[in-house]
């Protein structure tokens, strides 16, 4: 059974028991945790920097939502104040006074939230003074018979530091009531709270009392009776009342004739007559709520001021994010179509349908998007909570897909125009990278005459603003909902391990931009895919392509856009639907990532890492710094910029997996500054088809059996050093007149190499099943590349008993045992000399035997086992 399915089944059993605990005629339905506009100081630092409240929702609208969702008793729990309750009470509304106080646990230096009910204005003043020490706070509430609830007990901790077990033991001792169902938390977190409380009995409470030297009656009326509550924790109004509590009041009907509902609620809370209600929680509901909030910010946002932002407490990353968000909202507010959509979308979410006249004023290409938004107004009238949530979310997905299509089509036209204009193509890559740098001087942004960009940015962005901003808002809502629910994932994992219940299985999503291409990364991933299927590993490989065919453990997303750049036209850039990827990660129940490419999927990996708070590992296949220098001609300061960008990228991952000792030394050295414990060396293995085959030079190469054959296999490009083959071959031929060279592969330098070696035997790219015969029929493999991080060709060659002569660099240096199964050289002249020396010697059989022996050291089972252990998934995968 899948993890989420198991959680849902356990939750359904729990809800069924709670629903039938009390006689239905004697219960009041209430949402014990909801907010309105008076929750005006956000807990999150970025919200305080931007000076935005947690919501602009009015009390009246909140009450409408609560009543619509069947609540027959009312309360509002704003942060550290009950202003809304007092205002409503003055208007004659029967509302239970309440607040959610942010309290400090001084001995553990941890902040928690405490829902507090039935206090007076004077008591509120005292509670705000005491909340700096939760023990004094709870002593006060005990003395004055003010019921409290520890809100979302497993939320609000630093992901870097797990609160100790003693903290939870002590909180169990001093609290009577615990919020078990919170509408803003996922089912995993809620069920862990329930399981934790279930595992504590009277004997445990007595044990904690003795351990801490605390008399729990100082804090609790009945220390041995632990009650469970529920609340929506709604800030936007949407879904308020869908999670909450049934409160049991014996003889309710007659009691209501003389006692207000708020007093009866207070009585039931004090007596612990509470049964939580709700539903399976995942990110959909919270995504809708955050999208509602983003719309509210866009409609109400005001510039918080740059100086204020710079002087505000918080680290630089918080201020950079705040600065970017502030500029985003400011730009959105200047765009009429986007603001019209946001206003329409928000009003429809709140149940207000626009007039027919307004719909007629829309451009035709926007009408389908706006029409889908209008449907949301009707969805809110759904018959069940699930219908409402599913209806809202499906409309959001439809709108997102429409926006993506519109954005991709327009972006494709823009890029096509850039190709035709060729303003980028005619410039060197050096100058393009230099133009990406942002000047420090403010004057340079004001004085347009200093802007020497070759591209008219405003013209390029024209027509992209609405689909881009709207898509970003939808993606931001998904990101924020996942971040809110899962930012304590490391803690929840360890907490579940302590409870020995609801432990999430380890499951890897492996991301790559390349799978169907003819390159080393693709070849390795094909091998990995086969091993995943053979071994039944909990790993799925994901790529984005129109050509790759899906398979078991191979997920293929169709791109919403497919582009090539004027800079590097050989490689397609496929853009996935980020929301589709976001939901796929959740549905697949993955808990960690491996990424094999630095392109779009590299960015996707970092997005998922931060959205779901999972470990992300980067598998470094390519030396991009050398590629930038050798293949792209980048030099000097711009090469340094590339290095810094790579450093920033690699340091963003939890671990980097490298394929040779040189890479590890470089990454942990002064140039890159990665921590040594974050860099792990791994390796490739060769396909089982690579074994020694009978030599057949005649049919394969069209030469005599005794003709010495030099072999090169791989991409034919300058960065691979292939142009060195011509002078090497020429010099060897002077000594060994009958020697021939066979070159297998294709690439941009093929034509030049054919001109340089007119008598060379050139074979196009062949399927790997045909390569063993070619390797077995050659005499020595020449590898003039200084670029390869591992070089599968070396391992394939050795597996077929073919010695290799390569540069003493990177991957080959770690694989080849010098003077046993080949030679490691330092120059073109030394490679030439060793080739002549080997062909002149009688070492053929000795070297061939050593080659096959060395290849056996690279065993797939061992390599995969060590790889999984290095990414923290070894125990469950094997």
Please provide the spans of the model-predicted regions.
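Short hydrophobic beta-strand element within catalytic cores of glycosyltransferases
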Residues: 803-806
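Short alpha-helical donor nucleotide-sugar binding micro-motif in glycosyltransferases
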Residues: 766, 773-778
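Aromatic "clamp/platform" in nucleotide-sugar-dependent glycosyltransferases that forms part
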Residues: 786
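Conserved donor-binding/catalytic core segment of Leloir-type glycosyltransferases
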Residues: 510, 702-720, 726-730
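Conserved acidic donor-binding segment of nucleotide-sugar-dependent glycosyltransferases
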Residues: 818-829, 837-842
